């Protein structure tokens, strides 16, 4: 006595999100990140590291680093953040010792981004408050792959 195999009982692997991008293959990259931010007639330079999936088309990651600001860049403000991107659209949130900043922007495959955000300060004399504009680059040539 045998059983006929039905196509309706076929087991299919679960779909990944986002379904249009098959980038999650068990590797993450540690990448240097540089940025320039302007807000409230003040500017700063940012240097840090980004930990993200190994796809440049879509995905996301976390980063940490510091802003260097003020005359002769003596003011140092640490910051951590999370962001997500899909081709041309990027969005995220950053948290520093002085403010929280949600932001959205345009991304060129997460190699170069231009973000606009709004910094909500909690410090008495914050580096940023109000609207912000950032230019961000992840230096993918210096990426270091890490297995999950």
Predicted features and spans:
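Generic signal for short, ordered secondary-structure residues
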Residues: 2, 82-83
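Compositionally biased, intrinsically disordered/low-complexity regions enriched for serine, proline
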Residues: 10-11, 29
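Outer-membrane beta-barrel translocator/channel fold
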Residues: 16-18, 24-46, 65-79, 85-148
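Bacterial Sec-dependent N-terminal signal peptides
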Residues: 1-10
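Surface-exposed, glycine- and small/polar-enriched segments that build interaction surfaces at terminal
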Residues: 52-61
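Extracytoplasmic strand-loop-helix segments at the start of, or within, the mature domains
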Residues: 49
């Amino acid at each position: 006595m045998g059983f006929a195999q039905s196509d309706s009982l076929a087991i299919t692997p679960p779909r990944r999100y986002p379904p249009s991008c098959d980038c999650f293959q068990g590797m993450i990259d540690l990448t240097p990140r540089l940025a320039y931010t302007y807000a409230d007639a003040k500017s700063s330079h940012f240097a840090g590291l980004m930990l993200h999936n190994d796809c440049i088309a879509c995905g996301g990651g976390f980063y940490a680093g510091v802003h260097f600001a003020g005359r002769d860049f003596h003011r140092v403000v640490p910051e951590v953040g999370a962001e997500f991107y899909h081709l041309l659209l990027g969005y995220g949130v950053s948290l520093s010792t002085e403010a929280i900043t949600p932001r959205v922007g345009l991304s060129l495959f997460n190699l170069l981004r231009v973000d606009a955000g709004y910094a909500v300060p909690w410090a008495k004399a914050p580096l940023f408050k109000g609207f912000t504009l950032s230019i961000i680059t992840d230096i993918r040539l210096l990426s270091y792959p890490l297995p999950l």
